[in-house]
Amino acid sequence: SKVRSIDFFTASAVTLLPFENFALSSNQQKNQLPNQSVTSQKDQQPLRIGFISATSVGGMDLSERFYESFKKNPKQGRLREVISHDCGASTELIASYLGINDFITTISTACSSAANAIMLGARLIKHGQLDAVIVGGTDALCRFTLNGFNSLMILDKIHCRPFDRSRTGLNLGEGAGYLVLQSESSLQRAPYCELSGYANTNEAYHQTGSSPEGDGAFLSMSEAIVSSGISPEDIDYINVHGTGTPGNDASEGMALRRIFGEHVPPFSSVKAFIGHTLGASEGIEAVYSVLSIDKGLIYPNLNFTDAMPETGLIPETSFQEGIPIRHVLSS
């Protein structure tokens, strides 16, 4: 189907809120999310601050912009200059704007990009390399990306329906989401919560598809729970990946059944609100997870009507407030 032209936008200023899978806890221990940024340690030594940003399709707009000149003259068109996409340009610009230079890197691992950024930041703090790290991701859309996903035949022409029997695909979105991870020794204010565990895996089933048994999701979620030092029964809410594609939701649902059996905690996908924001998705959904603990929120899984026959799982369909939530698993 034809995709209409999209206007590009430039953000002149950003507000930073203070993976494969990670678990968040209300306890205060090692890697923490502060209420505001901290510029110095208690002993007045400068903080070692890093910036780890994720993207999945960063730089693809260059190919789109250069294509017209290439089409007019293939021998001189600027598309010949594009050897590779510089997906780290936004990372360097944001770090420069914020004055961060201790550690800067970009991660691009498709839709797990921001989750891996969060995990790397936590590890750098754990091993004493940094005191604080801004972690998350950002992605913006262009026709190149939209048509690429359209060629995969996984776009839904109407609102996506995560975990619904009638789901046929995803809706793309764009945006950014970041957290500030900080070591306990450098904290000057009470944190929102603790990043208590994390894990990623590679099931090597297929280049773009998940195993029907949910092996990858099962392993990463299980290991994240073990890493956090809690048991599956301690999870109060799950922010699932829930793209709305037939393959992902069936695979992820099988993983949930394997871990929790008949006692799957309340879960939902926020992608029906924000779309699949690609490399930014796990950063944005980490913010949702933090707010879930801080404010006692459970988000509704929009557009759900009928359970998938593969698992019979029913997500939360109403917005809930004031719920005592100690541990959130984000997939």
Which residue ranges define each predicted feature?
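Acyl-CoA/ACP chain-elongation machinery
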Residues: 129-151, 156-167, 198-212, 240-249, ...
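Conserved active-site "lid/cap" helical segment
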Residues: 1-31, 35-53, 59-60, 220-232, ...
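Active-site-proximal gating segment of KS-fold condensing enzymes and close homologs
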Residues: 55-105, 248-262
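Active-site-proximal alpha-helical scaffold in enzymes
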Residues: 14, 18-19, 87, 95-98, ...
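Glycine/charged-rich beta-loop-alpha catalytic/anionic-binding loops adjacent to active sites
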Residues: 70-80, 96-107, 156-164, 201-202, ...
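Flexible, low-complexity linker/loop segments at domain and module junctions
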Residues: 43-46, 234, 312-331
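Condensing-enzyme catalytic core mediating Claisen C-C bond formation in acyl metabolism
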Residues: 159-228, 237, 324-326
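Active-site nucleophile and cofactor-binding loops and adjacent substrate-binding regions
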Residues: 3-7, 81-88, 105-113, 169-171, ...
